[in-house]
Amino acid sequence: TCLGLDVATHFDVNLTDDDIAALDASDKPEAKFLRQAIRFVNNRGFEAYCTSIDCMAVAYAIDPSIVETFEGHVGVETKDGLTLGMTVLDARHHFVWKQLPVVHIGRKADHAKFLQLLMELVLQ
């Protein structure tokens, strides 16, 4: 399964003031680590959602209902050019590159469900 930044980095994946207060009040190492990461990105002008990009993939592994997926033929560009190193989806309905593997691709996430799981995991 491929979860792109368009799904994992979303403004709706931001913690509330109550969430931040709960992290501050916790002595769990996971909560302290997340709070430290949030401070780090906040001090650089970014929001808390920047700290949870990889967490979305872990959450999907725990509960696949968090992300809606679809299947598509996907390749990774390895030659020089504009898309070097990028994952490329062949979204055409005809002349599809059938030699490419079919991958499950994240379309959208249930951000509220994700944040609830994230907070439960770091606070328990």
What are these model-predicted stretches?
Residues 1-124:
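Conformational coupling and interaction surfaces
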